[in-house]
Every structure is written in C-alpha cells, then in structure tokens.
Amino acid sequence: MGMTLAEKVWADHLVRKGSDGAPDLLYIDLMLMHEVTSPQAFEGLRLAGRTPRHLDQLIATEDHNTPTVDIDKPNPDETSATQLTTLEKNCREFGVRLHPLGDADQGIVHAFAPMLGLTQPGMTIVCGDSHTSTHGAFGALAFGIGTSEVEHVMATQTLSLKPFKTMAINIEGDLPAGVSAKDIILAIIAKIGTGGGQGYVLEYRGRAIEQLSMDARMTICNMSIEAGARAGMIAPDETTFAYLKGRPHAPKGEMWDQAVEYWKTLRTDDDAVFDAEVTLRAEDLEPFVTWGTNPGQGVAISGVVPAPDDFADATERSAAERALDYMGLEPGTPIRDIPVDTVFIGSCTNGRIEDLRIAAEIMKGHKKADSIHRVLVVPASSRIRLQAEREGLDRIFKDFGAEWRNAGCSMCLGMNPDKLVAHERSISTSNRNFEGRQGKGSRTHLASPAVAAATAIRGTISTPADL
C-alpha cells in the first residue's frame, strides 16, 4: 500500500521503530526557539551538564514579548524584559544562533525561517510553539512541542513519538474572486470543529490549494492547530521550489538539483489511504469571520450572528451562549452591522508581504473610519518590513491613518505592549480569538487582511466588495 506525504517524511526520519506499543524515535532536522518556551529547557541542559548535540540545527529569535515601537528603549514590562535577556544569555552560553530585536533577520519565528530558506520540503521541524505547523506549507512535517521536549531535542536531536494519524482536506475547484487562504482555513475549522483534527496531520489538497502562493499556503498550515491537529502539510511543487531558490540557506548548484529531485517524491501516493477525509467545494466559499471566542465559531460575512438554539449539540449550545455574552453580540445581528474599534494586520498567520500588499491595495486612496480608534500594521519579520518599505507600502499605511510598526507578534496575544482594553472590539488577521487573547476583556474577530482593510475603511465588518 502507498504512503501519504506525512508518512513518507516520518519514515525518512525514523531512527528506531517502537515495539509493543512503544513510541518511535524520530530524528529532528531543525528546531526553532523563542524567549517564552526555552528558558527551562536551557536550565535543564545546564543542570544536567549537557550541551546541544547539533548547534547548526538550532536557531532562535525574539518575537512574543518584543515591543513594536521604541525598540531601542528598555522594555517597560519586567517579565517580558527578563525573558528576552534570559534568551540572550542562554544563547551566548550555549552557542545557539540568535536573531534578537533589532537584527536584520529578527521576526516571528514562523516567518523569518522560511524567508531565510531554513524551512525546506521533507524536513522535520519543531518549536516550543503551537503554530510551528506553518512550515508544513513546504511539505515539512512541522509541529509544536513542550518545553521538556525542547530540552530533549537540544540534547539528542530526536523525539520519542507515536505516529500521527492522517487526514486529507480536499478543496476542490477554483476559488471565487475575493476569497483568500484565511477564508479557506476558517471555513475548514468551522466545518470540522476545533477538535476535529485532534491527533492528525492534515494534508491540504486539491486545485484550489495548488493555485495558492507560498504565503497563502503558510496561512492555511499555520491554523491547522486551531482545528486541533498536530500538523498541517501541503505537497511541495514548482511554486515551492521557486520560493526557495536563491534564499540564503537553500541548497546551491548541484545540491539544489539533487534536493529538488528528492522533493518531487514528496507527494501522497495514489494508492495511499488516509485515516479520515474531508472535502469542501471552493466555489461555495466566501469571505469568513469569527463571531465567538474560538476559531470554530465562524460564519460567512454574508450571514448573521447565530443563536444558541441553532446548535443541536448541548456543549456547542452552551459555548455559544457564553461566547455571545462575552462578545456583547445579539443573535440575528448581520455580520456586516458589527462595529469595530481596532484593526490589527499582522501575526505569523497574515503578516507576510503578500498580506501587506493586499491590505495596502485596498487602503490606497482611503482614510480610516473616524470610528476606528487605531489600525496597527505589523510585519511578521524585519525582512518583510524592509521589503514593504522598498515597495512604498508603509507610506500607504501611514497616509491611511495606520500605525506602521516593527516586526513581532504584537497584538496577536497580550504578552507585549500592543493590547486591547476591556470590551474593545478588534478585527484581527491573527489566529486565536479566545477570551482575553488580545488583552483582558478583549473581543476579537478573526478575518483575512482584505476584510480587515475594508473594515478599517467602513468601521463595520466589511469586504472590499462593500466599498
């Protein structure tokens, strides 16, 4: 019987097959690190008197706690400052490569690695961060791990794991105009639920996926974890190879040719069998937005806020009641009638150059609505920021009335100065809309960059077609 893409990558990295129910031992090609989940791992190495096994397969950056303004000034938050200085100290002591705040290659961990060509097809990639699934857009098996596992990888370059199940997510047909990768993944999560992918590697397939750019593919794989999955993957193709060619850490010369030859084998075999399969028709999709407090509570923008009675399952009904109360929404309210206070464009989900271009094209020649308190545009990496400035996108954002920031996780999460206040409502291109995610009492609607930009113009949740 044939193998799926995930099974092929797993088999290529199998050090030892587990027996009698024991986990396999898997080799890890690359581990990415940041300031939040690494301190205890370094301390564990220190206490055990160990050193990293392969320094050239470890790389760190500062992203979660970093300010996006006044980056040359002391961090005002003591806890954040401590985590950043601790990472810098640990990397110096153990010899781990670090791209700190202010470095030309600094950025969100899942944005800077692909841009440097560190992320490549067929690799196993881990990080103490759930959105490591982003790198699966290249045909890598990439997943988040806990802090104790971070220590284990530093010490051994391996992990003990039981094989993941596999699920095919087929997006058949062609996407309608105005529908983006973010709309696809939000629709998928709404369909299968936030636990629908639990224990699975999701492989995204179909013509609609194949037509996406690498930036768009990363958006989809990034949010696999919001469906409960361990990882998300897309088979590498000519789009993948074109993105990687010439990047600093991509293979060169004959090594490039050999790599591409191998990468072309990384496709699910025709006779492979998935453990589960889900199919959506691309032409049925439309711009999507969340209304509640988990990424699965979403609807098409043409719809209305649902009522608890719309849910047959008692648990979902109870969750809807709580979400409506927290979000301050009434059932039956048209999504387009929901006013927004703040717009956030950024994160490891939608802070790449393509996302910024889309937002800038919509904002060009407009001004933000008077009712909008602020619009934050935060590139996912320093390289993306520089590229956007070379293209003049920063001037469009500033003319519009937006704040153009330095790279970082920013308002995706309340771990840095970019936060919402209680009951402030945002439309955000990030990945999570949990209670308090963007600050205590914050209310978050997840959407695409196009929807966020249009909303900033009109003041209520909108699409570019509404302008």
From Swiss-Prot:
Classification via Pfam families: Aconitase (PF00330)
EC number(s) given by UniProt: 4.2.1.33
Entry binding sites for [4Fe-4S] cluster: C348, C409, C412
Keywords: 4Fe-4S, Amino-acid biosynthesis, Branched-chain amino acid biosynthesis, Iron, Iron-sulfur, Leucine biosynthesis, Lyase, Metal-binding
SUPFAM superfamilies: Aconitase iron-sulfur domain
Cofactor: [4Fe-4S] cluster
Top-level class of the enzyme under EC nomenclature: lyase
GO biological process: L-leucine biosynthetic process
Paired cysteines (S-S): none
Keyword Iron-sulfur carried by entry: yes
Cofactor binding mode and count: Binds 1 [4Fe-4S] cluster per subunit.
Pathways per UniProt: Amino-acid biosynthesis; L-leucine biosynthesis; L-leucine from 3-methyl-2-oxobutanoate: step 2/4
Entries under CDD domains matching the protein: IPMI
An MF annotation (GO) of this entry: metal ion binding
Keyword Protein transport (UniProt): no
Catalytic reaction(s) noted: (2R,3S)-3-isopropylmalate = (2S)-2-isopropylmalate
Xref: NCBIfam families: leuC (TIGR00170), PRK05478.1 (NF004016), PRK12466.1 (NF009116)
Family: Belongs to the aconitase/IPM isomerase family. LeuC type 1 subfamily.
Summary of the function given for this chain in its UniProt record: Catalyzes the isomerization between 2-isopropylmalate and 3-isopropylmalate, via the formation of 2-isopropylmaleate.
Quaternary structure, from the entry: Heterodimer of LeuC and LeuD.
Name of the protein described by the UniProt record: 3-isopropylmalate dehydratase large subunit
